[in-house]
Amino acid sequence: MVILKNDKLTVSIEEFRAEIKSVKTGDGTEYMWQGGGEYWEGTAPNLFPIVGRLCDGYYTIDGVKYELGMHGLSYGGNFKVIEATQDRAVFELTDSEESLKSYPFKFSFKVRYTLTDSLITVDYIVENRDDKTMYYSLGAHPGFNVPLAKGGNFAQYYFEFEEEAKPIGYELTADGLITGKKEPFSLICDTILPLTGQEIFVPTVFLEDMSTKVTLKSNKTRRSVTMTYEGFKYLALWHDDNSPFICIEPWTGTPELIGNSRELKDKNGITALDKGKTDEYTYTIEIK
């Protein structure tokens, strides 16, 4: 376990999946969902080179079939620590003989964590090390405890978006695939989304044209989590039915669109990266 620590926060990160496992304040309050039990086992996985699920678990490149599990290679792990200090850690996932069987590109996917006061900055660095154009999507999947404070309950919490927005909601199947149906998604005063009373909420809300800053909060406590995600086109909000956590997931792409071409380059929200080039993305988590 890699530990980042200052007088405000202690952040514990597992090497294998470069995954935040714990974020604690100075008084010992845990903000991250701890996984396990009857609910989701993860805490904050990183998603690459796809987000979500593929139809029938495969895609094609020039007609050749490749099988790849939900959320891609990084969800399965095998990262290595390449830098670790008291306030910064960098993890890297690279291609291997095994990965080339399901994703035929030579690549580097780095996840860099930087701790500054009560702010965690997460950078994704994608490098195409191949001699051809590489296609990918990526995203974050952090899960936070709800309630954040003792004595509270899930129904007291809501999302407050910094900017007014009129997002588009995607209809998803029970397996998390996109049906192709989209419609306006209502927010209270264009900024507020309660965690309860939304039939569409369970299990996932998937939004486009969303504000790029959101706070998970309650009027019953001063504790909150704020995320920014400039450069991520989509936002997924996921919650296991009756579970005591919520995931805030900025993504650059989408799950598979039913009936779409199976070619990876035609996948909804896919990014094309030329040979030898690098892309970078950043999101932040602020703990209060």
Give, region by region, the residue ranges found by the protein language model.
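Acidic, contiguous internal or C-terminal segments within carbohydrate-active enzymes
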Residues: 4, 95-148
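Beta-strand-rich N-terminal accessory domains
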Residues: 1-61, 65-68, 210-231, 277-287
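Active-site pocket scaffolds in enzymes
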Residues: 223-288
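Hydrophobic residues positioned within well-ordered beta-strands of beta-sheet architectures
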Residues: 89-91, 109-111, 122, 138-140, ...
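Extended, loop-rich substrate-binding clefts of extracytoplasmic carbohydrate-active enzymes
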Residues: 64, 69-117
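Beta-strand-rich interaction surfaces with strong enrichment in secreted/lumenal proteins
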Residues: 110-112, 203, 268-273
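Active-site/ligand-binding surface loops and adjacent short beta/alpha elements
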Residues: 146-229
